[in-house]
């Protein structure tokens, strides 16, 4: 899940590893950041 993401989304989202391999980014499919 996105529990470790440094950003969260108020709609459908996907979590991906950050380029540094440690941080996760939460990418909103609708581009709606919370």
Swiss-Prot record:
Tissue specificity statement from the Swiss-Prot or TrEMBL entry: Expressed by the venom gland.
Disulfide bond entries: 2-16, 9-26, 15-28
UniProt keyword Disulfide bond present: yes
Molecular functions per Gene Ontology: calcium channel regulator activity; toxin activity
Record keywords, A-Z: Calcium channel impairing toxin, Disulfide bond, Ion channel impairing toxin, Knottin, Neurotoxin, Secreted, Toxin, Voltage-gated calcium channel impairing toxin
Keyword Secreted listed: yes
Any one cellular-component term (Gene Ontology): extracellular region
Localization terms from the record: Secreted
Record comment regarding domains: The presence of a 'disulfide through disulfide knot' structurally defines this protein as a knottin.
Family (UniProt): Belongs to the neurotoxin 02 (plectoxin) family. 01 (Tx3) subfamily.
Described purpose of this protein according to its UniProt entry: Inhibits all known high-voltage activated calcium channels (L-, P/Q- and R-type currents) (Cav), and most effectively the P/Q- (Cav2.1/CACNA1A) and R-type (Cav2.3/CACNA1E) currents. In rat brain, inhibits glutamate release, neuronal death and loss of neurotransmission in the hippocampus resulting from ischemia. In vivo, induces rapid general flaccid paralysis followed by death in 10-30 minutes at dose levels of 5 ug per mouse.
The protein's name: Omega-ctenitoxin-Pn2a
Native organism: Phoneutria nigriventer
């Amino acid at each position: 899940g996105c529990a470790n993401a440094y950003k969260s989304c108020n709609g459908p989202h996907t979590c991906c590893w950050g380029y540094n391999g440690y941080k996760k980014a939460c990418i909103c499919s609708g581009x709606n950041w919370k």
